């Protein structure tokens, strides 16, 4: 630290040799003494701060330089919350035209900006404007320290929008193209910190940062690559930005696909996450596959790194939404690795994305359906169905519901004893889980060539199909009531005597249907609907001469439509009993 004051003797410029006032000479003497015992003193208050402040306000350039260097060294070692009295002299130094002072003052402010409270106070005291001015200068060290300080300030949420609207983004974008790697790192890091809110991302895009970030994906520096891939990943969260990227950045996808093979694990992960966000749009779902993304993704979902597995399975999940990609994904060898991901019981997200992808692939071509069953996906999903978080159960039940829609899959599902999972799932308190399970169960009761498994599951497990029908008839939830009635009708239309007898001879089921018929009939009567002539409606609210009541009529229309549909199904069922 003694070197901070040694410049008093050597400089020859006029400001350096300005006469030193007595109070300044005293401050120098005191400061040298304080520095000898610096580990025992607080330089942010009392005598040490007063001595430093005296030097800051001196007309002698050497004294200002000494103060700046002292502040830089002290703040590097001792970082804590400070007062306005500490920041004010540093901000004064920041406005100096002397490069040495600028470098040291920016460094000191950047050091203090590590503290969360200081970040807010620096911006409140007008620190952004002089920092922006320093960024726009020619001195590389000054640029580097000024950008580093803004990077630190931008980690505080309260500051982000102020920085975004301060005029800092354009010089930051310019400095991101600097030939000096330290400046480039700090600038891209600062831009990344500005991508955590939609409003700030919009400012960033408007400042022209996107083409720079995309071009820097080719950087040989892993830090710059990481900052740029992460920033672009965040920018791609917004639909408007994805559309703009699609129009203006034709090489973005191919660059990100290449980075999935980066030696840096975090770059690889962020590139994959960026592709995941882009794949929210249909056009990108196709483009990622065309750019050769599948071989990288199938390798990454088998990685030992959980963040990489999560990023890659989330990406393939989005890509699998597009029907044209389904066969290509299956051919690329994803099915068995996806099934293995269902064993990640410590990661609910990985399980959810894996099941969701399997669901998207399940009901495509006959070839894919066959490979799906051969992969062990049904058995693994059945195994997890009753022993996994609700979010995973929801995805599994949706997968079963999709599979059960295809007539060619029904017997395979029944032979896999899927009813052992579906029936208990109908008890779930989560309506999505119970509804999907019930829909799958209903479809499996419709148009199958062999009803042996249906008959075996009539009253077991958990009261069996019979119990499910009775519970859903009593649910007071129109969707569930509809599923129960439709299932009963399918069983009665099965042309299987044993199945028909099970339904017809069950008083609880038949009484439930009759009660539903009575309730829906009364509901429709109260609404003025003649169930014997549905086209006739006595409700005055629908009368052309009473147009002011149209809103009232439209409010009740969905309920009336649901009641009419339920009533009609009950009548079809009851005809089988005559």
Swiss-Prot record:
Annotated GO MF terms: identical protein binding; protein-membrane adaptor activity
One cellular component (GO) term of this entry: membrane raft
Highest rank taxon of the organism: Eukaryota
Locations listed in the record: Vacuole membrane
InterPro entries per the UniProt record, alphabetical: ARM-like, ARM-type_fold, Armadillo, Vac8
Sites of Phosphoserine modification: 11, 16
Lipidation (S-palmitoyl cysteine): 4-5, 7
Substitution effect: residue 51 to R: Fails to undergo self-association in the presence of NVJ1 or ATG13
ARM repeats: 37-75, 76-114, 116-155, 157-196, 198-237, 239-280, 282-321, 323-363, 407-446
Placement of covalent cross-link Glycyl lysine isopeptide (Lys-Gly) (interchain with G-Cter in ubiquitin): 77, 515
PTM section of the record: Palmitoylated on one or more of its N-terminal cysteine residues by PFA3, which is required for vacuole fusion.
Ranges of Low complexity composition bias in the record: 533-552
GO BP field: autophagosome assembly; autophagy; Cvt vesicle assembly; establishment of organelle localization; lipid metabolic process; macroautophagy; nucleus-vacuole junction assembly; pexophagy
Keywords: Isopeptide bond, Lipoprotein, Membrane, Myristate, Palmitate, Phosphoprotein, Repeat, Ubl conjugation, Vacuole
Gene3D superfamilies per the UniProt record, alphabetical: Leucine-rich Repeat Variant
Spans annotated as Disordered: 527-557
Entry membrane topology: Lipid-anchor
Lipid-bearing positions (N-myristoyl glycine): 2
PANTHER family in alphabetical order: VACUOLAR PROTEIN 8
Domain notes: Comprises a flexibly connected N-terminal H1 helix followed by armadillo repeats (ARMs) that form a right-handed superhelical structure.
Subunit structure: Interacts with NVJ1. Forms heterotetramers of two VAC8 and two NVJ1 or two VAC8 and two ATG13.
Family membership noted in the UniProt record: Belongs to the beta-catenin family.
Function: Functions in both vacuole inheritance and protein targeting from the cytoplasm to vacuole (cvt). Involved in the formation of nucleus-vacuole junctions (NVJs) during piecemeal microautophagy of the nucleus (PMN). NVJs are interorganelle interfaces mediated by NVJ1 in the nuclear envelope and VAC8 on the vacuole membrane. Together, NVJ1 and VAC8 form Velcro-like patches through which teardrop-like portions of the nucleus are pinched off into the vacuolar lumen and degraded by the PMN process.
Additional notes on this entry: Present with 5680 molecules/cell in log phase SD medium.
Protein's name according to its UniProt entry: Vacuolar protein 8
């Amino acid at each position: 630290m003694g070197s901070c004051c040694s410049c008093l003797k050597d400089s020859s410029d006029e400001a350096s040799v300005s006469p030193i006032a007595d109070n300044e000479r005293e401050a120098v003497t005191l400061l040298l003494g304080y520095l000898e015992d610096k580990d025992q003193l607080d330089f942010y208050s009392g005598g040490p701060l007063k001595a430093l402040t005296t030097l800051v306000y001196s007309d002698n350039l050497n004294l200002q330089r000494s103060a700046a260097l002292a502040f830089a060294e002290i703040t590097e070692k001792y970082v804590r919350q400070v007062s306005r009295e500490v920041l004010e002299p540093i901000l004064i130094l920041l406005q100096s035209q002397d490069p040495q002072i600028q470098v040291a003052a920016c460094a000191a402010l950047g050091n203090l900006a590590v503290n969360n409270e200081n970040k807010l106070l620096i911006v409140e005291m007008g620190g952004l404007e002089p920092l922006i001015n320093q960024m726009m200068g020619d001195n590389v060290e000054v640029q580097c320290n000024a950008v580093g300080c803004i990077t630190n300030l931008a980690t505080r949420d309260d500051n982000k929008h102020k920085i975004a609207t301060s005029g800092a983004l354009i010089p930051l974008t310019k400095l991101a193209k600097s030939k000096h790697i330290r400046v480039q790192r700090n600038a891209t890091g600062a831009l990344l910190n500005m991508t955590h809110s939609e409003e700030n991302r919009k400012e960033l895009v408007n400042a022209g940062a996107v083409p720079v970030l995309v071009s820097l994906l080719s950087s040989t520096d892993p830090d710059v690559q990481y900052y740029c891939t992460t920033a672009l990943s965040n920018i791609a969260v917004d639909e408007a930005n994805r559309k703009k990227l699609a129009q203006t950045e034709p090489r973005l996808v191919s660059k990100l696909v290449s980075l999935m093979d980066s030696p840096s694990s975090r770059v690889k992960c962020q590139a994959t996450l960026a592709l995941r966000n882009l794949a929210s749009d249909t056009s990108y779902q196709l483009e990622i596959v065309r750019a050769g993304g599948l071989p990288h993704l199938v390798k990454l979902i088998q990685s030992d790194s959980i963040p990489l597995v999560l990023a890659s399975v989330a990406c393939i999940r989005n890509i699998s939404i597009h029907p044209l990609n389904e066969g290509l994904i299956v051919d690329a060898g994803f099915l068995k690795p996806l099934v293995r991901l269902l064993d990640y019981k410590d990661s609910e997200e990985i399980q959810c994305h894996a099941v969701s992808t399997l669901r998207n692939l399940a009901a495509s071509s006959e070839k894919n359906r066959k490979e799906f069953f051969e992969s062990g996906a049904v058995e693994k999903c059945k195994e997890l169905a009753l022993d996994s978080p609700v979010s995973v159960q929801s995805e599994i039940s949706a997968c079963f519901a999709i599979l059960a829609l295809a007539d060619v899959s029904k017997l395979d599902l029944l032979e896999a004893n899927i009813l052992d999972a579906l029936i208990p799932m109908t008890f779930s308190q989560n309506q999505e889980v119970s509804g999907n399970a019930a829909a799958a169960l209903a479809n499996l009761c419709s148009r199958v060539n062999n009803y042996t498994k249906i008959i075996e599951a009539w009253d077991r497990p958990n009261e069996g199909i019979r119990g499910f029908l009775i519970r859903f008839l009593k649910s007071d939830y129109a969707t569930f009531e509809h599923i129960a009635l439709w299932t009963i009708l399918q069983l009665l239309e099965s042309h299987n005597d044993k199945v028909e007898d099970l339904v017809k001879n069950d008083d609880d089921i038949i009484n439930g249907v009759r009660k539903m018929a009575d309730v829906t009939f009364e509901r429709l009567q109260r609404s003025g609907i003649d169930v014997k002539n549905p086209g006739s409606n006595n409700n005055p609210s629908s009368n052309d001469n009473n147009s002011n009541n149209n809103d009232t009529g439209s409010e009740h229309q969905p309920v009336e439509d649901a009641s009419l549909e339920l009533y009609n199904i009950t009548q079809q069922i009851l005809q089988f009993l005559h």
